[in-house]
Amino acid sequence: MIGLTHYLVVGAILFVTGIFGIFVNRKNVIVILMSIELMLLAVNINFVAFSTHLGDLAGQVFTMFVLTVAAAEAAIGLAILVVFFRNRGTIAVEDVNVMKG
């Protein structure tokens, strides 16, 4: 049977993969956003695993809120990237740093 440890290991692997994605590919903003979403998914897996292990629904409810906020964050981030690409013609991180007030 799959226990709590297995879910925590999967969550840790996903979280480390997200961190690795951010550190390896600092040039592409879309990959950075996807890595952040992967890290949030890993945290949600841990919330659900602990919630199931303890028999409490609070972790699962909190996971739904985190998923909602993550979806809104991804939609707003991609909308900003589309506008930035239309204005600048690129979405490189170096070009994002030159934006001023």
UniProtKB/Swiss-Prot annotation:
The EC number(s) attached to this protein equal: 7.1.1.-
* Listed Pfam families: Oxidored_q2
Q: Which GO terms describe its biological process?
A: ATP synthesis coupled electron transport
Q: Which InterPro entries match?
A: NADH_UbQ_OxRdtase_chain4L/K, NUOK/Mnh_C1-like
Q: Which reaction does it catalyse?
A: a quinone + NADH + 5 H(+)(in) = a quinol + NAD(+) + 4 H(+)(out)
The enzyme's first-digit EC class, named in words, is translocase
- Subcellular location(s) per record: Cell inner membrane
MF terms (GO), sorted A to Z: NADH:ubiquinone reductase (non-electrogenic) activity; quinone binding
* Keyword Lipid metabolism listed: no
Keyword Transport set for record:
yes
Q: Which HAMAP family match?
A: NDH1_NuoK
Alphabetized PANTHER family for the sequence: NADH DEHYDROGENASE SUBUNIT 4L-RELATED, NADH-UBIQUINONE OXIDOREDUCTASE SUBUNIT ND4L
Provide the family line.
Belongs to the complex I subunit 4L family.
Function, as annotated: NDH-1 shuttles electrons from NADH, via FMN and iron-sulfur (Fe-S) centers, to quinones in the respiratory chain. The immediate electron acceptor for the enzyme in this species is believed to be ubiquinone. Couples the redox reaction to proton translocation (for every two electrons transferred, four hydrogen ions are translocated across the cytoplasmic membrane), and thus conserves the redox energy in a proton gradient.
Its recorded name reads NADH-quinone oxidoreductase subunit K
